[in-house]
Swiss-Prot record:
Subcellular location(s) of the protein: Plastid, Chloroplast thylakoid membrane
Residues that coordinate or bind ATP: 170-177
This enzyme's EC code(s): 7.1.2.2
PANTHER family: ATP SYNTHASE SUBUNIT ALPHA, MITOCHONDRIAL
The keyword Transmembrane helix appears for this protein: no
Name of the gene this protein is made from: atpA
Annotated protein name in UniProt: ATP synthase subunit alpha, chloroplastic
C-alpha cells in the first residue's frame, strides 16, 4: 500500500508556488480557415501589421501582406504541407529581417539567409530588415568613380560607375549572366564586395556560376543568394531584398558593393503568382498594379553614399530576359525606366560570333564619361560614333557594288574595331590593357593585319607591354591619364611588335 507523506506533498506544493510566474502574456492568435498553393487564409489575428511575420503551430513562418475585413491572407515561406485547417497561428510582432555579418562572404545562402552550401551555420550578431527604405537625396552623391567590368565594349562605350543601376537585357542564351559574372571576377583586388542573387534559376546553372567563382578565387569577396525554380514563390519574391540587405550592410560600413539580380522578371512572376492567389486584381499581363513598385523599391536602394555617410556604394546590375527581342514588354520597360542605362545583348550578334554580344548602338549609360578614368576618355572618346557609322556603312555597302577607297578603308577600320571588342568568357581585362587595345585599333595600327590575326596580335602586344614595358602600366595606374610619355612608349611597342608579328606570320 502506498503511504502518503505530508512533508513530501507540502514540499512539492511549495516548489510549485515558488516557480509560479505571474507574468501575463498577450498573444495575438488566429485560426487557419483555408490553406493551399502557398497561401493561407486566417481568421482572427486582429492586430496584425501589414508584412508582419506569423508563426503556424507546426513552426512554418508566413508573411501577412493582405489584411481584409474578415480574414488575413498569409503567404507561406515553406511548403506548408503539415498545416491543417483549424490549427492556430500567432503573430510574432516582427517584420521580416535577416542576420548580417562579414561571415557571409564566400557562402551560398537562401532568401532567409540560411546557408545551403553544407558548410555549417554562419555566426552573426546583427540583423537588418529585408525591406528598408532607400537612401534619400541628401544621403547620396552623384556617381563619379568607375566600376570596371573588364569588358572592353562596356568600359569604353557604356561605362558603369559605383552606385549606378545598369540593366543587362537580352533574349535567352545571349550571355547576360556571363557579362555579370565576368564583372564579379574583375572585382578581384578592387576591394568590392559582390552579391549574386539567383531568382528562379535552374539549380545546375547556379552551381555552374558558384564553381566558376570558386575556380577563379572570387568566392572570398562574394555572397551567393539562391532561390531556384522549385522554391516557393514567397522565397523567390524575397531573395532580391535579402541580397540588397546584405549589400547595404557593407555599404553603410563605407565599403563598395556590387549586386547582380538574375533576374527580376522571375521575381515579378513569383509576385504575380502570390498576388493572384491572394485574389488581388490583375492588371497588364495579369501582373498586379504595384509590380513597378516591386522593382523600384529594390533598385532605388542602390546608391553612392554622401561624404557624411562615408562614401560607400551599392552598384546594381539587374538582368532581364526578353522574348524574341521585345524590349517594349511590361517588365523590361518598367526596369528600363528605373535604371540609369541599359546594355542590350543581341541574339543575332551572338550567333554571328561577336561575344560578348553587346549591341553598342542601342546600349546606353546615363552616367556617361563621369564613370571613366581620364585615360579611357582620351582613347575611347570617338569609338562609339565610329562603330555606329561603320554599322550604317556596312548595311549600305551590301547594296553597292563599287566603293571608293575612303569607304573601303572606313569599312576595314570598323571591322577591326568590332574585332577588338570580342573577348573570351571569364577573361576580363585590366583598364590599362583596355587602353592599349582601343588605342591600337582606333589609330589604324591594326589596318595592315587580316581580321583573323587581330586577336592574336593584341594578346602578343599586351603580353609584351606587361613584361618588357611595365612603366606604361605604372603611368596609367598612378596618373589615371594617357600622358605623352605613355603614348610614346605604346607607339614604340606597337611598331616593334607589328613588324615582328607580320614577319612571323609570313615565315
Amino acid at each position: 500500500m502506498v503511504t502518503i507523506r505530508a512533508d513530501e506533498i507540502s514540499n512539492i506544493i511549495r516548489e510549485r508556488i515558488e516557480q509560479y510566474n505571474r507574468e501575463v502574456k498577450i498573444v495575438n492568435t488566429g485560426t487557419v480557415l483555408q490553406v493551399g498553393d502557398g497561401i493561407a487564409r486566417i481568421h482572427g489575428l486582429d492586430e496584425v501589421m501589414a508584412g508582419e511575420l506569423v508563426e503556424f503551430e507546426e513552426s512554418t513562418i508566413g508573411i501577412a501582406p493582405n489584411l481584409e475585413s474578415n480574414n488575413v491572407g498569409v503567404v507561406l515561406m515553406g511548403d506548408g504541407l503539415m498545416i491543417q485547417e483549424g490549427s492556430s497561428v500567432k503573430a510574432t510582432g516582427r517584420i521580416a529581417q535577416i542576420p548580417v555579418s562579414e561571415a557571409y562572404l564566400g557562402r551560398v545562402i537562401n532568401a532567409l539567409a540560411k546557408p545551403i552550401d553544407g558548410r555549417g551555420e554562419i555566426s552573426s550578431s546583427e540583423s537588418r530588415l529585408i525591406e528598408s527604405p532607400a537612401p534619400g537625396i541628401i544621403s547620396r552623391r552623384s556617381v563619379y568613380e568607375p566600376l570596371q567590368t573588364g569588358l572592353i565594349a562596356i568600359d569604353s562605350m557604356i561605362p558603369i560607375g559605383r552606385g549606378q543601376r545598369e540593366l543587362i537585357i537580352g533574349d535567352r542564351q545571349t550571355g547576360k549572366t556571363a557579362v555579370a559574372t565576368d564583372t564579379i571576377l574583375n572585382q578581384k583586388g578592387q576591394n568590392v564586395i559582390c552579391v549574386y542573387v539567383a531568382i528562379g534559376q535552374k539549380a545546375s546553372s547556379v552551381a555552374q556560376v558558384v564553381t566558376t567563382f570558386q575556380e577563379q578565387g572570387a568566392m572570398e569577396y562574394t555572397i551567393v543568394v539562391a532561390e531556384t525554380a522549385d522554391s516557393p514563390a514567397t522565397l523567390q519574391y524575397l531573395a532580391p531584398y535579402t541580397g540588397a540587405a546584405l549589400a547595404e550592410y557593407f555599404m553603410y560600413r563605407e565599403r563598395h558593393t556590387l549586386i547582380i539580380h538574375d533576374d527580376p522578371s522571375k521575381q515579378a512572376q513569383a509576385y504575380r503568382q502570390m498576388s493572384l492567389l491572394l485574389r488581388r486584381p490583375p492588371g497588364r499581363e495579369a501582373y498586379p498594379g504595384d509590380v513597378f513598385y516591386l522593382h523600384s523599391r529594390l533598385l532605388e536602394r542602390a546608391a553612392k553614399s554622401s561624404s557624411r555617410l562615408g562614401e560607400g556604394s551599392m552598384t546594381a546590375l539587374p538582368i532581364v530576359e526578353t522574348q524574341s527581342g521585345d524590349v517594349s514588354a511590361y517588365i523590361p520597360t518598367n526596369v528600363i525606366s528605373i535604371t540609369d542605362g541599359q546594355i542590350f545583348l543581341s541574339a543575332d550578334l551572338f550567333n554571328a560570333g561577336i561575344r560578348p554580344a553587346i549591341n553598342v548602338g542601342i546600349s546606353v549609360s546615363r552616367v556617361g564619361s563621369a564613370a571613366q578614368i581620364k585615360a579611357m576618355k582620351q582613347v575611347a572618346g570617338k569609338s562609339k560614333l565610329e562603330l555606329a557609322q561603320f554599322a550604317e556603312l556596312e548595311a549600305f555597302a551590301q547594296f553597292a557594288s563599287d566603293l571608293d577607297k575612303a569607304t573601303q578603308n572606313q569599312l576595314a577600320r570598323g571591322q577591326r574595331l568590332r574585332e577588338l571588342l570580342k573577348q573570351s568568357q571569364a577573361a576580363p581585362l585590366a583598364v590599362e590593357e583596355q587602353v592599349v587595345t582601343i588605342y591600337t585599333g582606333a589609330n589604324g595600327y591594326l589596318d595592315p593585319l587580316e581580321i583573323g590575326q587581330v586577336k592574336k596580335f593584341l594578346v602578343q602586344l599586351r603580353t609584351y607591354l606587361r613584361t618588357n614595358k611595365p612603366q606604361f602600366q605604372e603611368i596609367i595606374s598612378s596618373t589615371r591619364t594617357f600622358t605623352e610619355e605613355a603614348e610614346a612608349i605604346l607607339k614604340e611597342a606597337i611598331q616593334e611588335q607589328i613588324e615582328l608579328f607580320l614577319f612571323q606570320e609570313q615565315t
